[in-house]
Regions:
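Flexible, glycine/threonine- and acidic-rich loop/arm segments that mediate assembly and lattice contacts
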Residues: 1-5, 14-218, 222, 228-301
Length: 301
């Protein structure tokens, strides 16, 4: 009785019977007034009831307060470091391709951001050496934290267009925003392309979220699809897709520990310069049910 207190109206979805809660004195039980309005319904075991407002007599005292017991979810920030080195000889060499130090800095930054992005997808929440003065922490990623998983292994890797539609309407858009982003692998993109040719008429929306997305409209919401380049490189992700509700995700970093370039990390007697990019960040996931993870989707029929 977290939400059903004395005065709450309950409806039996199977019979239409309306009941009013008259007492909520125990943690797991309710006393109700049956058959409001003069009906004469019976109630079966395991009948499904839902709350349909409340009704109180004139001059009544205030009802019992309802309870809200939120589930606590945690994650860690992870330290990412990408160093690069240029010898003093190379720095002093006039190269046709331009400044080597700048070139290596650009490449190192790309690798650094790729490391962070992959951790946001595939990282596993963990802490090692937790009792020491120098613990090592790993941030949990999307694929390891999302509990709304549609694994097609039990269906021989098959999900038809009708099954996909039902998953969107009944599961994926059941909670959260009416627009979500699907990052998918090449095989999943091929499945969706076949669906789109038959019915959906996909429309390209340019510049959204910094990438080009293809919009699929459904009765439940709009699915914005992007063939993720990382999923081409990561084994096992060609037949997978991660569906994200961005308002319920946050990139978190410690104060002063967002991505920065730290210069001159070389030893004092080293004939080279060494710099590194360093970030201490993690992923905050709110309302886990708003996201989804599809995997092992090999065929559509």
């Amino acid at each position: 009785n977290l939400f059903a207190v004395a005065g709450t109206i309950l409806v039996n979805s199977g019979t239409g019977e309306v009941m009013r809660v008259t007492a909520d004195s125990t943690a797991t039980g309710l006393t109700v007034e049956r058959n409001i309005g003069g009906t004469s319904h019976t109630i079966a075991d395991a009948a499904e009831l839902f709350i349909a407002g409340s009704a109180y007599e004139e001059g009544a005292n205030s009802p019992t307060g309802v309870s809200f017991d939120a589930t606590v979810a945690t994650n860690y920030t992870q330290i990412f470091r990408t160093a690069f080195k240029v010898t003093e000889t190379l720095r002093a060499t006039n190269l046709r391709t331009g400044d080597k130090e700048d070139e290596m800095a650009t490449k190192a930054l790309k690798l650094h951001m790729q490391d962070i992005e992959r951790a946001m997808f595939f990282g596993k929440k963990h802490e090692s050496n937790g009792t020491s003065a120098q613990p090592r922490r790993f941030t949990g990623g999307l694929t390891t934290q999302i509990t709304n998983v549609l694994d097609r292994t039990s269906a021989s890797g098959v999900m038809t267009e009708d099954q996909f539609d039902r998953a969107l309407i009944e599961d994926i858009f059941a909670f959260g925003s009416k627009q979500k982003i699907m990052f998918c692998g090449a095989k999943v993109a091929g499945h969706l392309q076949k669906f789109g040719k038959d019915r959906w008429q996909p429309t390209v929306v340019e510049g959204t979220y910094g990438v080009n997305l293809t919009q699929y409209a459904t009765f439940a919401g709009d699915l914005m699809v992007h063939l993720h380049p990382q999923f081409r490189q990561v084994p096992g992700m060609a037949n997978a897709a991660v569906i994200i509700d961005f308002p319920y995700l946050k990139y978190r970093y410690l104060d002063g520990r967002d991505t920065s370039l730290l210069r001159d990390r070389q030893a004092a007697d080293e004939d080279a310069v060494k710099h590194e990019f360093l970030t201490e960040c993690g992923l905050e996931m709110m309302q886990d049910k708003t996201h989804a993870y599809i995997k092992n989707w090999n065929n559509i029929a």
